Amino acid sequence: MSLVEPTEPVEVDKLGRVHFIGMGGAGMSGIARVLLQRGVEVSGSDARDSALLRELEELGATVHVGHAAEHVGDADTVVVSSAIRDTNPELVEARARNLRILPRAAALGALLLGRCGVAVAGTHGKTTTTSMITVVLQHLGAMPGYVIGGQLVTTGLGADAGADDIIVVEADESDGSFLMLSPRVAVITNVEADHLDNYGDLEEIHDKFAAFIGRVSETVVVGVDDPGARRVAEVARQRGLKVLTYGEADTADYRVRDITVDGFTTMFTIDPPTGDPVHCTLPLPGRHNTLNAAAAVAVADTIGYDPEVAVEGLAEFAGAARRFEFKGEANGVSVYDSYAHHPTEIAADLDAARAALDSQAAKGGKAGRIVVLFQPHLYSRTRIFAEEFAAALTKADEVVVLGIYAAREDPEPGVTAELITERIGHDRVYYRPDRDAAVECVVSVAQPGDIVLTMGAGDVTELGPRIVEALG
């Protein structure tokens, strides 16, 4: 993957008939869904059939499995996934016919035009924060549109056109494509080194976030505990934007304090800039999720809603798919799935799991352990962050590591998941590149009271249900 050349979005009513190449992914299917709901004629293709494709077909899309030039049909606009190669026959056909070709983010940007757009950006926490904002606004009586990188657990949907002026979207910095969005409000959760296959270094990432801030028209909501996000806040102030901060720091406009944990429920207080403190009960573990929640309250307040009512919506938040998602329980072992694929994300989820187990033990429960099944994502990320991955995974009691999920990359000589396993600071580590062997290993070490976490951005997510079944 490489950085995407920014393309200015086109108003939805000027797109004409739209064809999606690579329509089966979460991001592309979400945009297609919203366009269908807004009355746009949509067709699309993907290499493999999927439930998402069938859902779009039921909404009225013309769906093709496999790629062929004739699938483009009489489209006026073609939207292309970043996973599509230049040699794709549909893309070749679209270019030969001089059709309007948009990257995914430009199509997403079209959905924001003329609406109160809220875009959530940052290295970590985007999907959960976008989901929280959506659920909070729904609780407050709004009917926002939304396009999220994961599905809401309560509805099973990751996108909807909505019925009022607000739309909440997840802004992807990985390839620079968030520079095609022009939101009224932006959230910056944090800024760290990641996607270094695209960016030369952290400074280049900061430059891209600074450019993104230049596309925001009104307000920037920033996680003030993070040094990288604080730098972005300074850029926003210099450009005359309204800046609101959230975090545990005393200087935060929406200050999080008095965090307590009861199993997988987290209680805390938020001090807003005006008015009384608001008390929140969040049915999710993790200090990082209290910060995501504070961002959601700040956005709701910015739009004009009462923070005290907003936190009631957080109490109803059931989470987003693959974000510490409960997959099942068998023989006293609880299995969860996590999209964490960066060392910071892994450490945050393992800290959350440990806090939940400790709170249960403090009430006289069994002192359970953490068993992780981790799948490294990308050869480049494994090579760059091997030490950091090992340090984060040391927080688990038992660590089973799969082979690297290559995704878009070709193998690199000498780069395997063993770069991580050989650096983990205890001996309860098992390298199992074979999926069946990995599941068997997890089941053999798990004990009643333990938490099993499948972690990674690849197909490790498929193994959670298998582990539950095998444990039973």
From Swiss-Prot:
Keyword rRNA processing in the entry? The reply is no
A Pfam family matched by this chain, by name? Mur_ligase_M
Q: Its pathway?
A: Cell wall biogenesis; peptidoglycan biosynthesis
KW Ligase (keyword) present: yes
- Which Gene3D superfamilies did the record assign? Mur ligase, C-terminal domain, Mur-like, catalytic domain, NAD(P)-binding Rossmann-like Domain
Protein EC: 6.3.2.8
Q: Where in the cell is it found?
A: Cytoplasm
Keywords from UniProt, A to Z, are:
ATP-binding, Cell cycle, Cell division, Cell shape, Cell wall biogenesis/degradation, Cytoplasm, Ligase, Nucleotide-binding, Peptidoglycan synthesis
HAMAP family, from UniProt? MurC
Tell me its family.
Answer: Belongs to the MurCDEF family.
Role, per record: Cell wall formation.
Q: Output the NCBIfam families linked to this UniProt entry.
A: murC
Protein name (record): UDP-N-acetylmuramate--L-alanine ligase
